[in-house]
Amino acid sequence: MKLSAPLLVSLAAFSQAVTALVAFPGAEGFGANAIGGRNGQVYVVTNLNDSGTGSLRDAVSATDRIVVFAVGGVIKISDRIVVSKRVTILGQTAPGDGITVYGNGWSFSNADDAIVRYIRIRMGKGGSSGKDALGIAEGNRMIFDHVSVSWGRDETFSINGDASNITVQNSIIAQGLETHSCGGLMQTDGGVSLFRNLYIDNKTRNPKVKGVNEFTNNVVYNWGGGGGYIAGDSAGQSYANIIGNYFISGPSTSVTAFTRGNANFHGYVQNNYYDPDKDGQLDGFELGVSSSNYGGVAIMSSKYNYPAVAYTMSPAEAVTYVTKYAGASKVRDSVDTQLIAQVQSWGTEGGLISDEATMGGPGTLNGGTPAKDTDGDGIPDEAEKQLGTDPNTNDSMKLHSSGYTYLEVWANSLVPSTYH
């Protein structure tokens, strides 16, 4: 098989970086080597304001920053947030119930080396018309981990254009708003990894894939008539691994799991399950390896040599993991709690929505109490004592022997580093 030039470039770039420090323990896939703001400065978000000093918008407006939080709650935004290059956003550092950003979407276009963890991005019907809840049109090396994205007005989470080396893992992509109601486009030759995510309550594009893609251990629930996994539907060439996923029909589902493939979409498929009967039990079956079962794609006999997961779950294991841990799950908010309950109804609950009020909006979050941080370097005093740093000296951006900054070492310790 002749590989496309963009694919060869992408794989060469990844192979040169495999020995580099990964973004955080547990980072995988094409975007695993994003560096974020490791070589820059710390920015502590101290309020829930839309803009101004101490706000999240201000925090991501400049390059080379690691963003941590001394506040928890809902940040209501009027305009889209545009993220700069080499920014790390560590939502797990927020006290209380964490951070939800509500009211409009985010652009990560050209936000090279972004690292984003444990944050909720909820656009809503008041957001910019024709825009995604989270969109990437260009940029290289980004990883999104345990992110909950919902209520996009165009797509919910899309990656297009010249973007390359992107990973979305352990995340929830939910409830694109009607009448469009799309999970998202994943269409770049630069390489996108989708691992252990939940797509739920999107009429179509769960996701729609073109180009170079690894789709492993995801759960897709209650897609609508537009389609579940849409295989390109394009004259362009696509090369994908589709491994160990579970597709579960819900009340809105009226078409099969895979649609709109053609001879230009080359897919290596293995151990994907489909439960079409909406009977309140998880009792799906393995899809036979045939073009007809996979929407007309050209079935490949060998797996593409893309950066893969360290451990491939069975589809049943993927469902167990995703329902327990996907999204900003350090503390699950009311929205994600409802979504997981829908999945666990095994086909009897769920629906497409046009207004987030159906879900109770973003809900309320316990803001918690910020820990004492005498030197203001982002690491609480008690944690500094355990790390061996000085609570009275701004030293969180110094490098630990692991290669991460002390700030990253502390933040990484707050959440699990493995999934098996």
From Swiss-Prot:
<feature type="signal peptide">
    <location>
        <begin position="1"/>
        <end position="20"/>
    </location>
</feature>
<feature type="glycosylation site" description="N-linked (GlcNAc...) asparagine">
    <location>
        <position position="202"/>
    </location>
</feature>
<keyword id="KW-0325">Glycoprotein</keyword>
<feature type="domain" description="EF-hand">
    <location>
        <begin position="262"/>
        <end position="297"/>
    </location>
</feature>
<feature type="binding site">
    <location>
        <position position="277"/>
    </location>
    <ligand>
        <name>Ca(2+)</name>
    </ligand>
</feature>
<dbReference type="InterPro" id="IPR018247">
    <property type="entry name" value="EF_Hand_1_Ca_BS"/>
</dbReference>
<comment type="function">
    <text>Pectinolytic enzyme consist of four classes of enzymes: pectin lyase, polygalacturonase, pectin methylesterase and rhamnogalacturonase. Among pectinolytic enzymes, pectin lyase is the most important in depolymerization of pectin, since it cleaves internal glycosidic bonds of highly methylated pectins. Favors pectate, the anion, over pectin, the methyl ester.</text>
</comment>
<feature type="active site">
    <location>
        <position position="205"/>
    </location>
</feature>
<keyword id="KW-0456">Lyase</keyword>
<feature type="region of interest" description="Disordered">
    <location>
        <begin position="358"/>
        <end position="396"/>
    </location>
</feature>
<dbReference type="InterPro" id="IPR012334">
    <property type="entry name" value="Pectin_lyas_fold"/>
</dbReference>
<keyword id="KW-0119">Carbohydrate metabolism</keyword>
<dbReference type="GO" id="GO:0005576">
    <property type="term" value="C:extracellular region"/>
</dbReference>
<protein>
    <recommendedName>
        <fullName>Probable pectate lyase C</fullName>
        <ecNumber>4.2.2.2</ecNumber>
    </recommendedName>
</protein>
<dbReference type="Pfam" id="PF18884">
    <property type="entry name" value="TSP3_bac"/>
</dbReference>
<dbReference type="GO" id="GO:0000272">
    <property type="term" value="P:polysaccharide catabolic process"/>
</dbReference>
<feature type="binding site">
    <location>
        <position position="275"/>
    </location>
    <ligand>
        <name>Ca(2+)</name>
    </ligand>
</feature>
<keyword id="KW-0732">Signal</keyword>
<keyword id="KW-0964">Secreted</keyword>
<keyword id="KW-0106">Calcium</keyword>
<keyword id="KW-0624">Polysaccharide degradation</keyword>
<dbReference type="GO" id="GO:0071555">
    <property type="term" value="P:cell wall organization"/>
</dbReference>
<keyword id="KW-0479">Metal-binding</keyword>
<feature type="binding site">
    <location>
        <position position="286"/>
    </location>
    <ligand>
        <name>Ca(2+)</name>
    </ligand>
</feature>
<dbReference type="GO" id="GO:0046872">
    <property type="term" value="F:metal ion binding"/>
</dbReference>
<dbReference type="GO" id="GO:0030570">
    <property type="term" value="F:pectate lyase activity"/>
</dbReference>
<comment type="similarity">
    <text>Belongs to the polysaccharide lyase 1 family.</text>
</comment>
<feature type="binding site">
    <location>
        <position position="281"/>
    </location>
    <ligand>
        <name>Ca(2+)</name>
    </ligand>
</feature>
<feature type="glycosylation site" description="N-linked (GlcNAc...) asparagine">
    <location>
        <position position="49"/>
    </location>
</feature>
<dbReference type="InterPro" id="IPR052063">
    <property type="entry name" value="Polysaccharide_Lyase_1"/>
</dbReference>
<feature type="glycosylation site" description="N-linked (GlcNAc...) asparagine">
    <location>
        <position position="394"/>
    </location>
</feature>
<dbReference type="InterPro" id="IPR011050">
    <property type="entry name" value="Pectin_lyase_fold/virulence"/>
</dbReference>
<feature type="glycosylation site" description="N-linked (GlcNAc...) asparagine">
    <location>
        <position position="165"/>
    </location>
</feature>
<feature type="binding site">
    <location>
        <position position="279"/>
    </location>
    <ligand>
        <name>Ca(2+)</name>
    </ligand>
</feature>
<keyword id="KW-0961">Cell wall biogenesis/degradation</keyword>
